[in-house]
């Protein structure tokens, strides 16, 4: 197959050349989270969303690292909390739900996913991960195993969630958030970054793991072996 690529950068209207996340929504718009604003590209032009002084319905933080579409609306993860974009009003609202212990999401958000059972998982640097149930509107926090979560990934059968940690390596939970096990990624105890799992991706049923500065591993879910 033939692929054609076009570079899109600040000179073309992009708010910043550092792009952290990208999403094509159900309406065909391409959303790009950057270090200086959220961009919406429609194929012809680009609209930039940033913080507007004294405007309560704008983003309060321009550093956007995570995006997901939930019920036609956009969930926007920044480095100081979560915002919901309402498509009908073209406005943002701060996600102010709290846990039963009155904890709200205030840390840098690295990844947001929605699991098969409808739960929304939110990975943060500093507060572990949160799980939000849209049906009950209940928010729970898990920071027992690790406080610094870099990435989230579902298993091939959608029954488990893998979490990459900057402290403990690769962690596995069931779809409801129950801790199952830890996977040891590197045996090189002399490497200062040997357990820092940076990213995980499900490709054709295998979990690919990027760890440290130069390590790529593969988890076979059937045998639970890492090579």
Label the model's feature ranges:
Residues 1-227:
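Carboxylate-rich, polar loop motifs that coordinate divalent cations or form catalytic acidic clusters
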């Amino acid at each position: 197959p033939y692929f054609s690529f076009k570079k899109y950068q600040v000179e073309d209207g992009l708010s910043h050349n550092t792009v952290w996340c990208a999403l094509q929504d159900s309406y065909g718009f391409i959303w790009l989270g950057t270090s200086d604003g959220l961009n919406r590209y429609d194929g012809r032009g680009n609209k930039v969303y940033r913080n507007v002084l004294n405007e309560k319905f704008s983003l309060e933080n321009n550093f956007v690292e995570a995006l997901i579409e939930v019920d036609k609306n956009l969930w926007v993860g920044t480095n100081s909390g979560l915002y919901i974009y309402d498509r009908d009003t073209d406005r943002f609202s701060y996600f102010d739900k709290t846990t039963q212990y009155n904890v709200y999401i205030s840390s840098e958000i690295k990844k947001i996913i929605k699991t098969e059972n409808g739960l929304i998982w939110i990975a943060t640097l500093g507060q572990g991960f949160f799980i939000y149930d849209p049906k009950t509107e209940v928010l729970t926090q898990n920071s027992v195993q690790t406080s610094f979560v870099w990435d989230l990934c579902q298993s091939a059968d959608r029954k488990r969630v893998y979490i990459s940690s900057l402290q403990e390596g690769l962690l596995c939970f069931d779809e409801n958030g129950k801790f199952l096990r830890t996977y040891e990624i590197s045996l090189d105890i002399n490497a200062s970054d040997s357990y820092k799992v940076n990213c995980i991706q499900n490709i054709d049923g295998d979990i690919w793991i990027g760890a440290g500065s130069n390590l790529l591993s593969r988890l076979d879910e059937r045998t639970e072996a890492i090579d």
